[in-house]
UniProtKB/Swiss-Prot annotation:
Region (G5): 577-579
Signal peptide: none
Domain tr-type G intervals: 432-599
Name assigned to this protein: Translation initiation factor IF-2
Amino acid sequence: MSKKRLYEIAKELGKESKEVVARAKELGLDVKSHSSSVEEAVAAKIAASFKPAAAPKVEAKPAAPKVSAEKKAEKSEPAKPAVAKEEAKPAEPVAPKTEKVAAKPQSRNFKAEREARAKEQAERRKQNKGNNRDQQQNGNRQKNDGRNGGKQGQSNRDNRRFNDQAKKQQGQQKRRNERRQQEDKRSNQAAPRIDFKARAAALKAEQNAEYARSSEERFKQYQAAKEALAQANKRKEPEEIFEEAAKLAEQAQQVQAVVEVVPEKKEPAVDTRRKKQARPDKNRDDYDHEEDGPRKQQKNRSSQNQVRNQKNSNWNNNKKNKKGNNKNNRNQTPKPVTERKFHELPTEFEYTDGMTVAEIAKRIKREPAEIVKKLFMMGVMATQNQSLDGETIELLMVDYGIEAKQKVEVDNADIERFFVEDGYLNEDELVERPPVVTIMGHVDHGKTTLLDTLRNSRVATGEAGGITQHIGAYQIVENGKKITFLDTPGHAAFTSMRARGASVTDITILVVAADDGVMPQTIEAINHSKAANVPIIVAINKIDKPGANPERVIGELAEHGVMSTAWGGDSEFVEISAKFNQNIEELLETVLLVAEIQELKADPTVRAIGTVIEARLDKGKGAVATLLVQQGTLNVQDPIVVGNTFGRVRAMTNDLGRRVKVAGPSTPVSITGLNEAPMAGDHFAVYEDEKSARAAGEERAKRALMKQRQATQRVSLENLFDTLKAGELKSVNVIIKADVQGSVEALSASLQKIDVEGVKVTIVHSAVGAINESDVTLAEASNAFIVGFNVRPTPQARQQAEADDVEIRLHSIIYKVIEEMEEAMKGMLDPEFEEKVIGEAVIRETFKVSKVGTIGGFMVINGKVARDSKVRVIRDGVVIYDGELASLKHYKDDVKEVTNGREGGLMIDGYNDIKMDDVIEAYVMEEIKR
């Protein structure tokens, strides 16, 4: 038989454990505490002892009338609620009603219960206040004992503290038991629970019945039609059977459509969720909130244990649910593996060089491992992240049976494609454009004077030294038609500028002086024009001079491939005088005639492209570039890429210095708004938005930097000797600052071409703009001097140069810069000396003097012997000694030299083995000018 503990019996009876233990001892049971266990029979005996003897079973009485909560509260005492209930029981029953009333569960009066609990808590607080007062008095006694007593007082205090704690714990346990009893009573009086499963089953059955009723009629119609068809099939032909079957099928579809359109009526769903009931407040008094010490620690430990137990239970549940722990599912069949869908191969595959195996696999919907296997069979070892070249990709696609096509990628940063292809032009929008004419020729042959005459301005007077320093672009109007002129320098240093002018021009006017004829730069201009396939118009200038000979010029040009139309060639010759405005109109008419033959056209509707004629850095405006529009129309605020830089057209001025907003084809304009000054000769293109222009410009700058790094020379076995030899050369470091980019290029090229043996020119830095402080700092660090061409240093840069002793040389004529640089380079060389024999003498007699040495008497037979000259001793045609004279005398006098035919005496420094008939050769070392 099972056993029960006494505290379990007390809990069932709603009594305290002390009362149950005392009653068990009264019944003669050997129990020690509430944890003692007894048999079930003994437990029943103990429980029976608590039941009142005078409580016989009473027959069922009629239902007592409801008593109001206020009356119950008046009858009940706050200190002992249980006794109050017992006293309320013997109330006389009310006469039963004649009507039979169904028994209803009596509802709880929560308000009355809360008021009873409040009164009970108030009584308990009064008792606790008295206990606290007693405890305070005991504490004061303990303090007095502690002051007066010694060890005995300390032990008494400990005992009293222990007793107080024990009493406190007993009181807490008592209140806990009372709360449990009240909760048990409330749980016994709770309303019966709702069976949700039964309700759900009933609802489902009702829904099924409704569905059966709605579909019964359709089923009967279908069954009747089926039976009628079966009867008709017995006596009809097959053709009629098929026709009727088709009709019935149509009818069935119509019925089904009607059923689908008309929704079935559904009863509103019954809310079967359990309503949230009001839970009574826990019977806790304010004394529990004021507790601290062991009581509070015990509560914390119990809450921690609850959390720990919950975690352990969750861990155990998860462990049970893990794969393999469920023994009942071991023999179950595994779930079927879903088959992968088969994707058909594409018919075409567009690829780019450098595609990886993984990218190809994704495009053709195949596994990378399959492609790696195919490549291995083809003899190509590759991984899925490895890039493949175009040839390998094509072979792979052939193996799969796919047509491979290489994707043509348009490089957004490549603006050169606009100058090679013209597919972007609209043929319907092409219009005639002005011709671009370049004036070329030798220096001082009258190019700028001719252009000055054409423009009716005095440009030539502003040029230093009478030569043009950089390209100028101008536009004039002749007979209602515009002509754009480019003026190129004629000096030898500006070869690259003439080449750029020929590349953007349509017609070349070759100016040749009638008195000078063909010169080196004339031949160079002819070669540039022929290389650019540009027609040449020869303007024989200065025919007003007395020594002019145009026929000689025509003959010299014919020797270089420029034939006159009069001689059967294709070049027009016009004799002019730019100074006196002679035959200028004829020259312009010839230009328009040649332009008409060429049929020059452009599309002004597309975005503008063109070439940089010149670029410079302005102190107030920043980077300024002179552009020649070749196709399209350039507008203000257009996003533009120029060479390796980009920007937006902030302002635009024409050749007259006036602001314009639009520039059509063959129009030269100066723009501002670029990030940096571009290089002369760079191409430009307008983009659709600033974002794409910025991306293209940054990409072009990045490529230019990479190209520059790749061009860096490396030391190899072939050039090792040249590198070592170059290290022995002396170097002249130069920083070049000029007004325009063309002058910078010309200066750099000219200085590097200076050929002085043993010295080389190193261009440390070259840029456009004024000389600033950073240039001076760089010159000081690199031991260089600064050459300023048509620019001046800032005041701060000048002060810093004086303080740091940096040399700044300012020039406005290029050939003077070259001459000055040659002198500086020659001055850096070590002096070079040449040996020069000044005389010969023969030893006639020797004299040995003690403590002095050997003195040789000689006679000069050729030239002279000087005191500061060097001498060689030659014996039998062999040089015995080479040294210097220690003394030279004529008789007894010291002399500076002994001339031809005279006699004298000499003594050689450090040499005494002089003999008769020795030849003394006197010579000096003279410096050679380079």
